[in-house]
Swiss-Prot record:
The keyword ATP-binding applies. It comes from the Bacteria. Belongs to the RapZ-like family. This is Nucleotide-binding protein LJ_0866. Displays ATPase and GTPase activities. One of its GO terms (molecular function) is GTP binding. The keyword GTP-binding applies. It comes from Lactobacillus johnsonii (strain CNCM I-12250 / La1 / NCC 533). ATP binds at G13, M14, S15, G16, A17, G18, K19, T20. Keywords: ATP-binding, GTP-binding, Nucleotide-binding. Pfam families: PapZ_C, RapZ-like_N. GTP binds at D63, L64, R65, V66.
Length: 291
């Protein structure tokens, strides 16, 4: 079986066209990313990646420093094409002059070649230098009318894989007395629900026990709350997915994380799993099991 070629993505383009957004998006997709790599080191970088089993895909972001910089980049890219183990793609990010001027004014920064302080002169000089690189690029994305979210979506569509596009949910129960989970995206306080703690026959058990679960979920207050909570989540989750979120953590909390939060988390995981991949965890459960 032929050895699968490793992927090398070379990201370049106009300053202010979105390379910073591209870095973050590619890292989220599992790329090993190096920013501002000098072109003369491209071959050495690829040799390092190609000889390592830790990286299956890598990206380099090349920044304009001097006028000869991009001449070197094109030469290095062409030399890489002779390698039998490299599958390289050149991504060029572009934007119109007026959009770039507007972006620079918002950030109060100057293009790298705006030596006289004139924005448009610096942009036009950079565009002239980059023309050769743009001509050899495999993919050109004009970001003039793209939001950060839209650019990220385009990058995921072009360079992501099925794994990176998978959205998943973690449902966890916890006890407020032990602190709110710092990684939670949504925190729901269910301390207002009827508490099995005050039922002697149920107090020793947890929401993993059928008796406790049935007690919590059968209450009128629970039914009314849960129906609205589930409806809210089913409305909100598609929005999280549209924003590019890959994992949503929903934390359900009661006083000690023993009865109510565990019961609600169990039911929520079952219902959300009908549409999405769901993992469930009970942060405090070890405090009560085996007592």
């Amino acid at each position: 079986m032929a050895e699968q070629k490793k992927q090398l993505l070379i990201v370049t383009g106009m300053s202010g066209a979105g390379k910073t957004v591209a870095i973050k998006a590619l890292e989220d997709m599992g790329y090993f990313v190096v920013d501002n790599l000098p072109p003369e080191l491209l071959g050495s970088f690829w040799e390092l990646i190609n000889n390592s089993s830790d990286f299956s895909k890598a990206a380099v972001v090349v920044d304009l420093r001097v006028k000869s910089f991009y001449k070197d980049l094109v030469d290095e890219i062409k030399s890489l094409e002779d390698s039998q183990n490299v599958q390289s793609t050149v991504l060029f990010l572009d934007a119109s002059d007026d959009v770039l001027v507007s972006r620079y004014k918002e950030t109060r920064r100057l293009p790298p070649l705006a030596h006289t302080g004139r924005l448009l002169d610096g942009i036009q000089e950079e565009r002239n230098i980059l023309s050769r690189t743009k001509n050899i690029s495999n993919i050109i994305i004009d970001t003039s009318h793209l939001s950060t979210k839209e650019l990220k979506t385009k990058l995921v569509d072009k360079f992501g894989d099925n794994r990176t596009r998978t959205f998943s949910i973690e449902v966890m129960s916890f006890g407020f007395k032990y602190g709110i989970p710092i990684d939670a995206d949504i925190v729901m306080d269910v301390r207002f629900l009827p508490n099995p703690f005050y039922i002697p026959q149920l107090k020793p058990f947890t929401g993993l026990d059928r008796r406790v679960f049935d007690y919590v979920m059968s209450k009128k207050e629970t039914k009314e709350f849960y129906a609205k909570f589930l409806d809210m989540l089913e409305t909100a989750i598609p929005g999280y997915i549209a924003e590019g979120k890959e994992k949503l953590t929903i934390a359900i909390g009661c006083t000690g994380g023993q009865h109510r939060s565990v019961s609600i988390a169990r039911q929520l995981a079952v219902d959300l799993a009908k549409k999405y991949p769901v993992d469930i965890s009970h942060r405090e459960i070890s405090r009560y099991i085996g007592q």
